[in-house]
Amino acid sequence: TSSSGFFFTLMAIGMAVSRLFSGKLVDKGMITQVIQAGLYLVCFCFFGLSACGWLADWNLQATSIAFFTIALLLGIGFGTMFPAYNTLFVNLAPNNQRGTATSTYLTSWDVGIGIGMVIGGYIAEISTFKIAYLSGAILTVISLFYFYGKVSPHFHRFRLR
């Protein structure tokens, strides 16, 4: 439908906008902070998408505004995280393994997105999209804790650049 096309257009705009500032922050060495900000934003957006299901019962116009605002913010969140994660992987690899690090990251990202879509689709099929997005939000919260507890300390301890 036209609304899904508009959703993904806004998401693409958000991704483009995020590149204007996130790259500069990563260049200043704020890699983990940029990733954390992106994770927070994506988590907020998944909770927001879940809430849109309940908001639709109350006010359809407010739901549309929230839905499209979330699209823009989701694009900013993913656009912020994606290149920062790549930089994190590359900065952990020796110079002769940088290509392998990028390839590993991109493969992991694709597999994660694919698995997430299959599981999210299954959850939505047996329950509702509200529950599927709520599940995504909960998994993002778990990933935030994992990033704080394991990934960030490991990166700061073993980074090569």
Label every PLM stretch briefly.
Residues Y122-T140:
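A membrane-interface helix-boundary motif in multi-pass transporters
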Residues T80-A93:
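Intracellular juxtamembrane helix-capping segments at the cytosolic ends
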Residues A62-T80:
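Hydrophobic core of transmembrane alpha-helices in multi-pass small-molecule transporters
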Residues Q33-L49, A137:
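Structural signature of the two symmetry-related core transmembrane helices
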Residues F6-M15, W109:
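Transmembrane alpha-helical segments of major facilitator superfamily
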Residues T1-S2, N95-Y105:
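Loop-to-transmembrane helix entry/capping segments in MFS-fold secondary transporters
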Residues A12-L20, I113-G114:
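Residue-level signature of mid-helix packing/kink "hotspots" within the transmembrane helices
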Residues S18-I31, A124:
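Helix-to-loop junctions at the C-terminal end of transmembrane segments
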